[in-house]
């Protein structure tokens, strides 16, 4: 496990080279939560209701904004207001995967206006290094307007059965991240990837990529579509900094109670991991 994962969020925030990652760790420490809720609902009312009810217990809300049947200005302004009210970040799980010119327009232009409201986005590197370069270029442009308030996670691994995000794909994800550290804040992965070495890159002392792990569910081991779940304790134990839980929270009989349970288990696992550090 990367040595950075043994440090507290406060310690990592104090020295983190990425401004958004620094803010995220500060939020996690202040609220005592490492939970990201995946709010896979289909209407603006459901999304904003969940964000408001669960906001006090989460560090991040993850959206799939293109599944909303009624996306509008109300969606954007509502999410932004609730993120400010409850102090959480917004992660749009868009999984950009196209040529650079196209993803730039998808991110900063177009109907969904993602750059306007999503602090965090993610991408697959299947198109090659150009996708990371293109998104980083957009975020650093003089007219972008959001600067250090935006960051990218590279989809380096997946928790679904038979995932092809392994081996050289994962290694290349780390290579590309190291070239764009100001914008790439970390990975969606099942473990820390900071110690990955390749022919073109190697770890540096100041490197501290944030790990988001999907497929966290307290009461289920999987579904019929290939998803494989793990518990908050097992995910944090393997090196996750932030756990992503979806149906285990939003589809629970009492989503607020479920969010509190994930918060408790995730935080206890984090404290056990960092020990006396």
UniProtKB/Swiss-Prot annotation:
Record-listed substrate binding positions: 40, 62-64, 93-102, 229, 247
UniProt record, GO biological process: 'de novo' pyrimidine nucleobase biosynthetic process; 'de novo' UMP biosynthetic process
Entry EC number(s): 4.1.1.23
Keywords carried by this UniProt record: Decarboxylase, Lyase, Pyrimidine biosynthesis
Leader sequence residues: none
Active site: 95 (proton donor)
Pfam hit, one: OMPdecase
Catalytic activity: orotidine 5'-phosphate + H(+) = UMP + CO2
Functional pathway: Pyrimidine metabolism; UMP biosynthesis via de novo pathway; UMP from orotate: step 2/2
Source species, domain of life: Eukaryota
The protein's enzyme class: lyase
InterPro entries, per database record: Aldolase_TIM, OMPdecase, OMPdecase_AS, OMPdeCOase_dom, RibuloseP-bd_barrel
SUPFAM superfamilies to which the protein is assigned, alphabetical: Ribulose-phoshate binding barrel
Gene Ontology terms for molecular function: orotate phosphoribosyltransferase activity; orotidine-5'-phosphate decarboxylase activity
NCBIfam families: pyrF
Family statement: Belongs to the OMP decarboxylase family.
Name used for this protein in its record: Orotidine 5'-phosphate decarboxylase
Gene from which the chain derives: pyrG
């Amino acid at each position: 496990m990367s040595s950075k994962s043994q440090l507290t969020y406060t310690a990592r925030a104090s020295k983190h080279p990425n401004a958004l990652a620094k803010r995220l760790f500060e939020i996690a420490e202040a609220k005592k939560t490492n939970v990201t809720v995946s709010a896979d609902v289909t209407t603006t009312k459901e999304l904003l209701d969940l964000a408001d009810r669960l906001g006090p217990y989460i560090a991040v809300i993850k959206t799939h904004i293109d599944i909303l049947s009624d996306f509008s200005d109300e969606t954007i302004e509502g999410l932004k207001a609730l993120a400010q009210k409850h102090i959480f970040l917004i992660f749009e799980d868009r999984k950009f995967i196209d040529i650079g010119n196209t993803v730039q327009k998808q991110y900063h232009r177009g109907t969904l206006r993602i750059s306007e409201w999503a602090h965090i986005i993610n991408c697959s590197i299947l198109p090659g290094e150009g996708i990371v370069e293109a998104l980083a270029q957009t975020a650093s442009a003089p007219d972008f307007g959001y600067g250090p308030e935006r960051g990218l996670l590279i989809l380096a691994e997946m928790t679904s059965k038979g995932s092809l995000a392994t081996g050289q794909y994962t290694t290349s994800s780390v290579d590309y991240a190291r070239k764009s550290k100001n914008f790439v804040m970390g990975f969606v992965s099942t473990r820390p990837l900071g110690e990955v070495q390749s022919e073109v890159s190697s770890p540096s002392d100041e490197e501290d990529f944030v790990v988001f792990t999907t497929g966290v569910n307290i009461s289920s081991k999987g579904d019929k579509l290939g998803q494989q779940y793990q518990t908050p304790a097992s995910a944090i134990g393997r090196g996750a900094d932030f756990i992503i839980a979806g149906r285990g929270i939003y589809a629970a009989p009492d989503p607020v109670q479920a969010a509190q349970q994930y918060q408790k288990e995730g935080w206890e696992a984090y404290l056990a991991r960092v020990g006396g550090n």
